[in-house]
C-alpha cells in the first residue's frame, strides 16, 4: 500500500484515480472545490500548502493545471499555475522527504508534430503547452536518487463520462444521423481511455519510476475508425462519405487547425508509448458513455 497525496483532487482524472484505488492505497487529496471524498482538504490556493502537508507520503501526484481555455490569453497566468506552482509544490514535497513527484503533462509540448518519438523536438505552440514544458524541464532537473520526478504526457483522454471538445462534437454529429465526410480518412491519431490512464499513473507510483512517459491506448485510430466506434456504441448507422481532395485542400488552407484535428496524424512511437513500465492498455471502449445528446 502506497501513501499518496493528490493535488487537484477535484479534477476529472484525479476523481477517476481516487475511485479506483481508494480501497487499495492510502490517498489524501487537496482540492479547490469539495468532491465529497472522505480524506479531502479544501484550500483556496495550492501554493499555500505548508511543507508539513507533504510529510509522510510516498508520492505526490499533481493534477492541478489550467488547460486549454480559449478565453485565457495570458501566458503569465498559464506559467503561474502550470509552471511556477508545480515547481513550488515539488520543492515542498522534496523538502518534506517525499520520494516521488508525478506531474501530469501533455503531448502539446510537441506543438503540431504528427509523429512523436525520442528525437521529436519540443516546440509548443500554445500557452498551455509552453507552460507545461517549462515545468517538465525544471522538475526533471530536480530529480535525484532521493527524489524521483515522473512526467506523464498522455494524448487526448476519453471515457468515464468524459468526451473532450472535438470528440464530443463527433458524438453529437453521429447522433444527428447525418452523412459525415470521413469515408476517405486514413489518418492515425493516438488516444487514451481514462481507465488506461489511471492504471498507468498508478503503475508509475507502484514502480517508483522517474523520467518522461507517453501512455496511450494499444493502437491509434483514424477519424473514420472513431466515428465507426461511436456509431457502434450508440447503436446507430452512420454514412461516412469520401471527401474530394479539393475539399480537403480547401479545409487545410482555410482552417489548418480543424484539418489537423480531423484529418491529421498524431502518433506516438509504439515502443515509447507501450514498453516503458510494462503497462498493457486495452483498445478504445466506453467512448460514448454519458456523452451523447
Each model region followed by its residue ranges:
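Substrate-positioning beta->alpha
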Residues: 162-169, 182-205, 211-214
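C-terminal amphipathic/interface module of NAD(P)-dependent oxidoreductases
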Residues: 221, 229, 239, 258-293
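N-terminal Rossmann NAD(P)H-binding glycine-rich loop of SDR-like oxidoreductase domains
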Residues: 4-23
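Conserved Rossmann-fold NAD(P)-dependent oxidoreductase catalytic core, especially the SDR/UDP-sugar
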Residues: 87-127, 150
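Active-site Tyr-X1-5-Lys
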Residues: 123-150
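Mid/C-terminal beta-alpha module of Rossmann-like enzyme folds, strongest
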Residues: 200-258, 291-292
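Flexible, glycine-rich beta-alpha linker
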Residues: 110-111, 152-168
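NAD(P)H-binding glycine-rich loop region in Rossmannoid oxidoreductase-like domains
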Residues: 46-84, 88, 92, 112
